[in-house]
Design a protein with these regions (language model features):
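Sequence/structural signature of beta-propeller domains
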Residues: 1-129
Length: 129
């Protein structure tokens, strides 16, 4: 298994859990570039149809559904990504707009805090995509 981390400007990085030891320096492998001028705010893991997914909320690129089945064998990105995104694929979730916070509610739903264009906040339970 891997620990997955998302960082500003937005690499997705895997760290093999077996390599994590107390006090040791951790080196990860960048497996995706999810777009510049962006920051992930929340990331949840869920299972749907027998497959595992990440659902990632971002400041500038909306919510992304990322299948995890290719993570273990995904090659590291070691050169500049010359397109908007690169590495493991993802699917934008167009139905989730203005998401500021995201968490797993149960095995069928997420709970999201959204902000409308006028600034109003809503707390919603939504089906996992």
């Amino acid at each position: 298994p891997n620990l997955i981390a998302g960082y500003t400007c937005t690499p997705l990085v895997k760290f093999p859990v077996a390599s994590l030891t107390p006090g040791a320096k951790a080196m990860g492998t960048t497996i995706a570039e999810l777009g510049n001028r962006n920051r992930p705010t929340d990331m949840i893991v869920y299972k749907k149809g027998g497959k595992d997914y990440l659902l990632i909320a971002n400041t500038s690129r909306g919510v992304m559904k990322v299948p995890t089945d290719g993570f273990a064998g995904a090659p590291g990105i070691t050169a500049k990504v010359t397109t908007e995104t690169g590495g493991v694929g993802f699917e934008p979730v167009a139905t989730l707009k203005g998401v500021e916070q995201l968490d797993l509610l149960d095995d069928q739903r997420a709970i999201v805090l959204t902000r409308a264009e006028g600034g109003a906040l809503s707390l919603l339970a939504v089906a996992l995509p």
